[in-house]
Amino acid sequence: MSTPRIVVGVSGGVDSSVAAWKLAQQGEPIAGLFMQNWADDGSGDCRAEDDRRDAVAVCGVLGIPFHFRDFSGEYWSDVFEHFLAEYAAGRTPNPDVLCNREVKFKHFLDAAQALGAERIATGHYAQVAHRGGRWRLLRGADRGKDQSYFLHQLGQTQLAATLFPIGDLEKSTLRRIAQDAGLPTHAKKDSTGICFIGERDFREFLGRYLPARTGEIRDPQGQRIAEHPGVFYFTLGQREGLNIGGVRGRAAAPWYVVGKDVANNVLYVDQDRDSPLLQSRWLQSEQAHWVTGAPPARRFSCTAQTRYRQPDESCTVDVQDDGSVQVRFERPQRAVTPGQSLVLYDGEECLGGAVIAATDAPLERQLAGSSFSSEVVA
């Protein structure tokens, strides 16, 4: 068996299948590697075995070697324990960002290099370019599928060793390529959600690791409205799952989460979807990561996303002495959530990002006892 120059992360999905096919068409000596990142206990719907069989089948069609690596231990210690700690603290984490940084572009890269490969390739919708002496992370051509948001923690070492073969394709084109190439995954549905939860009820799953305490649901004036099953099951702006029935003297309208008092186990709700209590003009992050290794300037203007697939929002960024950033948006943002990722862009280039630590949303700021001042970036 010849040494592969490139190892492709084959997930058993259509995206990684076409990524491998494109490289094979170019005559590159490649191999496929399937990563198992969660030790499924049989009660979920991760479908890891089905995905593995599909990955084996794709490698067979392409005539390339197949490899398997179990990273479930690394995933548990590097991703899942952080996921639980964030929820326990009342924040809403994004495990996909951490999985990319710690597993797919660290442990997977190490495994590929151990096989003798120079580079790895994945089926992410993103692009890499080398400009001005630095590697740049760019959005995928299909803006509806772009995954640069989840890749913003990558750096120069990872990007120098990474290929995104499908980054220049639209999803519809990719499906046609897969069908024409006879790839067995051409009609396979895209995976959704977090693998380790699968199709399970989120509360049931999280409750296995974080025992919940019931508590009060209150309106912004502090009046008791209902009872919740656990404050960390909910995130800002959420409507589903509150199970608030008819409340005497209140309109028959939906309720939305506008605040979480983790210390006192109280959830605050309002019937205004765009409640002023959910609006933020400023945010404070934890330490930021820059794709090129440094920010463009100490203060600069760019666009930002505070949630995946959110429209770009214009903002001003101030880099602090401790490496964190403070961000001022041109217009108020709804339900900016601590624990989620702030990702910054200059046109098509992803500059980097950080975890959101605090905002100036009135109720959340009061509950957190935040000293964050919007005057810093005004």
Curated annotation (Swiss-Prot):
Reactions this protein catalyses: S-sulfanyl-L-cysteinyl-[protein] + uridine(34) in tRNA + AH2 + ATP = 2-thiouridine(34) in tRNA + L-cysteinyl-[protein] + A + AMP + diphosphate + H(+)
Major localization class: cytoplasm
Disulfide bonds: 99-195
Cellular compartment(s): Cytoplasm
Matches recorded under NCBIfam families: PRK00143.1, trmU
PANTHER family recorded: MITOCHONDRIAL TRNA-SPECIFIC 2-THIOURIDYLASE 1, TRNA 5-METHYLAMINOMETHYL-2-THIOURIDYLATE -METHYLTRANSFERASE
Record's protein name: tRNA-specific 2-thiouridylase MnmA
Species assigned in the record: Xanthomonas axonopodis pv. citri (strain 306)
Taxonomic path: Bacteria, Pseudomonadati, Pseudomonadota, Gammaproteobacteria, Lysobacterales
Gene: mnmA
